């Protein structure tokens, strides 16, 4: 396919036009008085959102250069969302301000590479200042505040704070759609995985259709169990102990399954068979997690253990296991705390080294099952459009709260960025590097300016007023008053603010150092075909 090429100022201005169109659509959502944006969907109802990354993803421009510019800024929003779960609009506003100021200097003859170095040094200094300012999250109320700001709803913030309080910072908090109005929080103690009993005959409570085993032995096998002869020696030993048995295996079928069911119905022996969770290598890993949690071993021929030779000391145990048709919950496994902690550290290391978002998510789930617990927030709404929007807001707020726990909190509302610009007095830069640093200094005003504008105030006046206030004091855009931001609960996670600035600077540096843009040549639309039918249809003969 033919390409078109633009150079120098033409190339950079084309990219800037695309960036401005995207940023202008996104920045109207910033702050407590930010507006919503309606996104048309080809199928179904339109989506209404104030989430920066969702809006950015929808924007596709026609002009090839503008399209590339918009795609670069999308990357800022997406990267910030991936790392911190929030701050996408702030990142977009910062990128727009940095690029605008940087391109003005490039057009005036500044060296783009020196500007880039100046921007990088300035951002490094501001990031360090933000982390220095950050206060550790010590109370449930602080978590509720940061989540409430992200979700623009105090009820959601309080529910997330309660969920984090129960499952810990390593715990998993998932959001599900509910058939009822309002919000519900469902907590799971212990480890839960999404496989239930193989046969309904295993249920001990027929009304609730669930099986409950108290102080059971737990057999964990990485293979199918079909031959009852393999299982009999172990069954006899377990029966002599008088305890129930939970079997977790790839599958239990044939004679082995029917023997277990018959003994359960007759009341001779209480047991439940459950399929192992996951597939392939993930299944092996999850069985290993269950073994460590319950103090057992995975019986697998890979490690030289055969089912027919298994002894009671290879079995795990727990205080209680509850099994429904869809899921199994192991409460209070008998594994050693040191071994569980070792496994947790191993999974953490795997998360850090993983390149795949999907793998990271699955590892995070495994970590939560071992280290914390699982909390499910069920969200309901009057319409499907509102439900989708609400669910998305809650998911963002959960990640925001976790980011706050990780690196602490700073004053929100664009105040931390503006007041961090004091570090520029200590930066000893000269020439175009100093010009690059100055571009960052000006860009740090942009989020606060935009929040003020969205609140119907004069941006420049607000910036000057906040610049002269005590550190940590700023504008509460919801009321128009100047307050102590942290005391009022107007806070942002330091990780969100830092990531937004670093990602914006990274893309801005690419814009400034671009000297040529190569894009696909737009194809001309084919001429419309002639209408069908015989010629001369209107003529009289």
Curated annotation (Swiss-Prot):
Catalytic activity: ATP + H2O + a folded polypeptide = ADP + phosphate + an unfolded polypeptide
Localization per record: Cytoplasm
Coiled coil stretches, renumbered: none
Keywords: ATP-binding, Chaperone, Cytoplasm, Isomerase, Nucleotide-binding
Its EC number(s): 5.6.1.7
Positions of ATP binding: 29-32, 86-90, 413, 476-478, 492
A single MF term (Gene Ontology): ATP binding
GO biological process: chaperone cofactor-dependent protein refolding; protein refolding; response to heat
Pfam families: Cpn60_TCP1
Keyword Repeat: no
InterPro entries in alphabetical order: Chaperonin_Cpn60_CS, Cpn60/GroEL, Cpn60/GroEL/TCP-1, GroEL-like_apical_dom_sf, GROEL-like_equatorial_sf, TCP-1-like_intermed_sf
Keyword Chaperone attributed: yes
Gene Ontology CC: GroEL-GroES complex
NCBIfam families hit by this protein: GroEL, PRK00013.1, PRK12849.1, PRK12850.1, PRK12851.1
Function per UniProt: Together with its co-chaperonin GroES, plays an essential role in assisting protein folding. The GroEL-GroES system forms a nano-cage that allows encapsulation of the non-native substrate proteins and provides a physical environment optimized to promote and accelerate protein folding.
Protein family (similarity comment): Belongs to the chaperonin (HSP60) family.
Subunit details: Forms a cylinder of 14 subunits composed of two heptameric rings stacked back-to-back. Interacts with the co-chaperonin GroES.
Protein name: Chaperonin GroEL 2
